[in-house]
């Protein structure tokens, strides 16, 4: 089996919904980052482009994004939709194609524009149509599992697991503090592609305080735990990495940052989806015969502070090596892009701290978790 390596990659600054990227369609935002990745790594015609997207307009929006970037029409591009896990699963799919020998170099990651999220017109014959409205946003989890599954899932998870708002608030403060530190010290500057006029990650709040958290209203009617602060922002952004084979490295005289050791996914209760990030991570480590202490850095997409608490309870000796640059509570969560973002953050953490193994995981709408294991190339 051919080894799959990651050369590196770039991400945009993360914008808040209706923020700096408010008029930028998803395919344009993704294309701008993709162009910079191709230029940095001198790629004219990769074998594939694999991109995650959660709420894109139209079929196979990754192909539209690639063509918008000026990628040659001979290069195939396809979209992966695992909602929040789309970007990470795209990287896993790309690695598998390289493992199989089908491809030598692939650009993978994801992109999202919540600001330009498409609306859906109701068909009068559809059972959801009541005659009260003609349009709604595209649904994450239609049917029996209801629309607001992620917020409800976080609320339900907090109740089931006995998680308090105070526990979650401590993670909100940590995330913003670490993200502020990373910004002020330029710790992530090497992976930023400044596009479309953005100059910073818009969600980071340097002055986040307990006083502000105490004033936050609950977001669900009758809810006890979930607020706008301990759940992620709604965001726009894009992130891509370049994966390649050993042969490609040798032919081009390149050195990779990391080897992709493997990936896995799991299913769980769609109404308590946050736990799937932990389950996928545990499954991944067991699959590779690794223990908590073997992992130098963990990156999880903290869509909700519930996930942070679950991680700390499941991996109690790893809190200080978890989301070391802050997480989605500060940066935000541009659904399809988030897997690429946390992979890039993981690569930077391994490089800056000299760690050997790193693991990333995402919980996705619908009750799916996906996880990725990396080994730093020394």
Locations of regions flagged by a protein language model:
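Condensing-enzyme catalytic core mediating Claisen C-C bond formation in acyl metabolism
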Residues: 1-26, 159, 211-274, 279, ...
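N-terminal extracellular/periplasmic Venus flytrap/periplasmic-binding protein-like
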Residues: 11, 23-32, 167-251, 314, ...
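Conserved beta-ketoacyl condensing-enzyme motif
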Residues: 22-85, 89-93, 97-98, 103-105, ...
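Short, well-ordered amphipathic alpha-helical segments that serve as non-catalytic structural scaffolds
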Residues: 26-41, 61-65, 90, 150-157, ...
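Phosphate/pyrophosphate-binding loops at sites that engage ATP/ADP/AMP, CoA/4′-phosphopantetheine
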Residues: 35-47, 157, 161-162, 249-256, ...
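Conserved catalytic cysteine-centered active-site region
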Residues: 53-103, 144-149, 207-233, 314-342, ...
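Active-site-proximal alpha-helical scaffold in enzymes
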Residues: 82-112, 158-187, 241-247, 334-355, ...
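Active-site pocket-lining segment
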Residues: 155, 261-330
């Amino acid at each position: 089996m051919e080894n799959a390596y990651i050369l590196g990659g770039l991400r945009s600054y993360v914008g808040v919904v209706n923020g700096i990227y408010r008029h930028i369609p998803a395919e344009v935002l993704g294309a701008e980052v993709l162009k910079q990745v191709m230029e940095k790594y001198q790629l004219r015609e990769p074998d594939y482009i694999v991109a995650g997207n959660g709420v894109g307009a139209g079929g196979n929006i990754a192909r539209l994004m690639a063509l918008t970037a000026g990628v040659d029409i001979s290069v195939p591009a396809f979209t992966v939709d695992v909602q929040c896990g789309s970007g990470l699963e795209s990287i896993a799919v790309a690695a598998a194609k390289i493992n199989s020998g089908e491809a030598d170099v692939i650009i993978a990651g994801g992109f999202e524009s919540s600001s330009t999220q498409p609306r859906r017109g109701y068909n009068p014959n559809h059972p959801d149509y009541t005659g009260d409205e003609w349009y709604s946003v595209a649904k994450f989890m239609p049917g029996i599992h209801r629309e607001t599954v992620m917020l409800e899932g976080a609320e339900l998870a907090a109740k089931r697991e006995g998680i308090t708002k105070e526990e979650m608030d401590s993670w909100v403060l940590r995330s913003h503090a670490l993200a502020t530190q990373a910004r002020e010290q330029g710790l992530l500057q090497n992976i930023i592609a400044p596009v479309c006029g953005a100059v910073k990650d818009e969600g980071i709040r340097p002055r986040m305080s307990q006083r502000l958290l105490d004033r936050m209203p609950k977001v669900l009617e009758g809810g006890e735990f979930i607020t706008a602060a301990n759940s992620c922002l709604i965001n726009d952004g894009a992130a891509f990495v370049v994966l390649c084979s050993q042969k490609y490295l040798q032919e081009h005289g390149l050195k990779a940052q990391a080897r992709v050791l493997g990936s896995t996914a799991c299913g769980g209760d769609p109404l308590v989806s946050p736990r799937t990030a932990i389950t996928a991570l545990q499954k991944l480590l067991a699959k590779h015969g690794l223990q908590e202490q073997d992992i130098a850095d963990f990156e999880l997409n903290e869509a909700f502070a519930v996930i942070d608490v679950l991680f700390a309870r499941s991996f109690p000796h790893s809190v200080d090596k978890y989301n070391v640059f802050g997480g989605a509570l500060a940066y935000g969560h541009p659904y399809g892009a988030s897997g690429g973002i946390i992979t890039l953050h993981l690569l930077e953490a391994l490089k800056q701290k000299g760690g050997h193994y790193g693991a990333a995981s995402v919980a996705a709408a619908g009750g799916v978790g996906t996880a990725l294991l990396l080994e730093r190339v020394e």
